[in-house]
Every structure is written in C-alpha cells, then in structure tokens.
Amino acid sequence: MASMRDIKRRKSSITSTQQITKAMKLVSTVKLQKARAHAEATDPYFNYMYRTVSSMLAKSGNLEHPYLKAGDSPRKAVVVLTSNRGLAGGYNSNIVKLITHGDFKKEELDIYAVGAKGEELLTSKGYHIVESAPEMMEDPTYEDAAALCKRVLKAFTDGQVGEIYLAYTHFKNTVTQEAKLIKLLPVELDESGADEKEDSNILMNFEPNPEEALELIIPKYVTSLFYGALVESFASENGARMQAMDSATSNAEDMVSDLTLKYNRARQGSITQELTEIIAGANAIE
C-alpha cells in the first residue's frame, strides 16, 4: 500500500496537471468561439461560389478546359490541413488516415502540409512533402490561402500533377467534427447542387466565352473552397482540443477525489495504530 507521503505527492502532481488542462480548455473555448463566428460569417459566400460554379458547368454543355479533366501525370497533389500542436484527441490522426488508408499510392503523392503535425506524421511514414506551411494554421487568412492555391494550381497547369485533393476537418458543431477528403481539380459537377430547377430560367452569358470565364473563376473557386476548409479546420481543431482537455480535467478530478479518499483512509489507519500503541504502552506500565 502506498504511503501517505506518496499519495500526497501524487495528488499534488495530478492537481497541477488538472490546472493546466483546465487553462488549455478555457483558451480553446475562446479560440473556438472566434473561429466559429468566422466560419459562420464566411460560409454563405463559399457555398454560393460552389453552387455558382456547379450551376455554370451544368448549363454550359460540354466545355473543353484543362481544369475540367485530369492531367496526364499520374501524380496527385494533396493539401493536408492539420494542427501545429497535439492534445486534440484524434483530430490529426483522423486526417492522416484519409491519406494512409485511402486508395492513394504513396509514391504518386505530393503533399502540401498545412500544419506541423500532419507533416510530422506523413514524413515518418515516408510521404513526399512538397511544401510545409505551419504558420497558416495559427492565423488563417484569405491571402495566404490564395498564395498556396496559386502554387498548387501551377503544378496542375504545368502538368506536374494530374489531380488535386484537399484533406480537412469539417466543422459540424462544437462536439462533432468530420475528417473529409475532396477533389479540387479537375472540377467535378455535383449533381445535387447542379439540379436546381428553380434556377433553370436564369440565362447565363459568358464574355468573351465560357472557356475564358472558367480560366478566371475556377482559381477563385478553388481558393474559396480551400479557405473555407482552412477556417473550418481551425474551428474543428479548437473544438477537438476543448473536448480533450475537458475530458482530461474531468478524469483528473476523479483521480484527485480517489486519492483524497485513499489519503484519508491511510491517515485514519495511522492514527488508529498510534492510539493502539499508546494504549498498549500504558497497559504495560501498569
């Protein structure tokens, strides 16, 4: 049985850890509130951009454009959004599993790692990291998203990669986040988004022609999807960390309660033993 000193030392250590996890939970809660407000504010624009492109492709017939068909290269670019820090439950590992447990061939992937944890995990598994941008997850901005998208799109138009994918975490609510993998290029028509009968009477004209219109709008469309995913991932990270720290704080509280009970029992046993020895000594003197 552990001594009173050991129990007290362990209780003190767990209490210190509990204070840290509680503080981290509060920090994540504040960050989550800001990120959630940002995500909700920008979501309508990105959804509208997505529906616009889907509708445009559905009503334009069979357009011929490089953005609409896979390139000749067998290589695939995957932009992977993870966090720079751990202590977020399965947030990072769930994203990495989309890559490692999917249908991709490791030797055909070019990884653009946004977030240090994703880079670490994928590097350890032997994946080729083309670019690393951990700073982007600290304070996501549209300008940074546009700059990275420009480089990834150049790899596509130059024929270095034939397809572009995005792995991110979709923010459903505070307690639910979903790891998702979507294809950015070539653009694929979403039948559910394109089959909107209420928009069928809208007449679309492209100036000077549909191909040149796509040349301008597709990069903005891809950047919009990427930035939207970046904002959602940032919110999801803080939601996942808040849950993890809440669980850790609760577990620490249970352990402290259990150790307090053990300490009191040990103390009671020690007092009882001392009284017994005193009584026995008194009886011996008599």
Locations of regions flagged by a protein language model:
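C-terminal beta-strand-loop-alpha-helix "lid" module of Rossmann-like NAD(P)-dependent dehydrogenases
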Residues: 1-286
